[in-house]
Each structure stands twice: as C-alpha cells, then as structure tokens.
C-alpha cells in the first residue's frame, strides 16, 4: 500500500526507486556469471517484498544478438535489444564468455563494444565479472577505475587498460564464490550517497 500525502497523492519519497541493472549478454556467456549475480538481486528483491517493501533492483537482459548459446549449451532468447540510452543511475554488468573473450571480430561483438562506448558514462556503476573486464577494456571503460580479471587474461587487460586504477568498478575473478561476492554488497550501495533513495 502506497503512503499518501495530505492531498491524497502518493508520497514519492516513501517509494524506493528501483535501480535498473543491465546484464549485457554475448554468445557463449558463462552461465554462472549471469545466473549467480542475477539470483542475488532477485533474492534481495524477494526479501524486501516479503517485508512489504518495494524491490531495489529492476533487471534487464540485453544483447546485440536476437538469440545466443551459453557456456553450457543452453540457448537464450527473449532478451531486449541494446537500448538507445541508459538512465543516470543504471548499473551495467559485463560477464565472461567462454572461448571468445579475445575475439571481438564478429558483428555483434563490434556492436556491443560501440554501444558501451556510446552509452556508459561516469554516473553509471560498472560491474565486470571475470573476463567481462576484457570487454570493458575494449570499450575504454576502465580508465580511472579499479578492476581485475582471470589471471590468464591479466596481461591483456593491463595492455587494454593501462590507466585503470581505484574507482567505482566492482570486479570479480578467480574462484566460483567471487561471482557471488561481487554482487552481495550491491544491495548496501542502495543506501550510499551516490545512488538516489527515492
């Protein structure tokens, strides 16, 4: 039930603003990197809703392709095209892709890199998971940001983003739990000064 003002209108300050989270998907998306963080955001929303509160996250799954196959061979469809613009408070999640993290020659990969260059701005939050950082590096998004990647791709990342440093870029690599650890703190950022609370 919405809180009402004295004039009978919804009190906008009492209705939390759901943060738009955009998962950028590519061919051979590493399934765990997609499902793990998405489930954390979903569970956070479900917990809040069980307490009668509004959800914190509004997830969007986007791609330059109309369909794709994940790392485990399961096909994905039904996601949205890359949007023409992103809201100022958006979070963009870049996940790893098995066997294609160093290949950006396909039409879809080039479109994805070009879209990231056009759309991602300093006001946005960027989360890279494992070799999702390589995609961010290709798009020139890591200058002035903190990042890491799988050790086998570390030198390539340094070459792509020589000016990367401490910033607002949660990034995970290494063991399986790291995928989840990168997403777990995100609900707490909802209270930070950097994101609006309503």
Descriptions of predicted regions:
Residues 134-140, 173-174, 189:
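Acidic/polar active-site rim loop that often engages polyanionic ligands
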Residues 136-151, 179-181:
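Short beta-strand and adjoining strand-loop segment in the mid-core
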Residues 174-198:
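Conserved anion/nucleotide-ligand pocket segment
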Residues 126-127, 148, 167, 180:
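Structural detector of well-ordered beta-strand residues that form the stable sheet scaffold
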Residues 1-126, 136-138, 193, 197:
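Extended, subdomain-level signal for the structured scaffold at the beginning of enzyme domains
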Residues 143-171:
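A conserved active-site-flanking secondary-structure segment within enzyme catalytic domains
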Residues 113, 150-154, 189-193:
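Hydrophobic, well-ordered secondary-structure segments
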């Amino acid at each position: 039930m919405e809180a009402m003002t004295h004039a009978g209108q919804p009190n906008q300050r009492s209705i939390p603003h759901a943060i738009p989270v955009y998962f950028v998907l590519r061919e051979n998306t590493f399934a765990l990197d997609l499902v793990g963080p998405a489930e954390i955001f979903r569970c956070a929303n479900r917990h809040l809703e069980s307490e009668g509160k509004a959800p914190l996250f509004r997830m969007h799954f986007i791609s330059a392709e109309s369909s794709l196959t994940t790392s485990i061979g399961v096909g994905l469809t039904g996601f949205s095209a890359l949007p023409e613009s992103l809201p100022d408070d958006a979070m963009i999640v870049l996940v790893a892709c098995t066997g294609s993290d160093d290949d950006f020659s396909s039409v879809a990969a080039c479109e994805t890199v070009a879209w990231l260059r056009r759309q991602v701005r300093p006001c946005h939050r960027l989360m890279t998971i494992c070799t999702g950082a390589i995609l961010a590096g290709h798009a020139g998004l890591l200058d002035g940001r903190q990042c890491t990647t799988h050790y086998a791709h570390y030198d390539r990342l340094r070459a792509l983003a020589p000016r990367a440093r401490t910033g607002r870029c949660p990034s995970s690599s290494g063991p399986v739990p790291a995928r989840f650890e990168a997403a777990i703190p995100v609900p707490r950022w909802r209270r930070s000064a950097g994101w609006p609370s309503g």
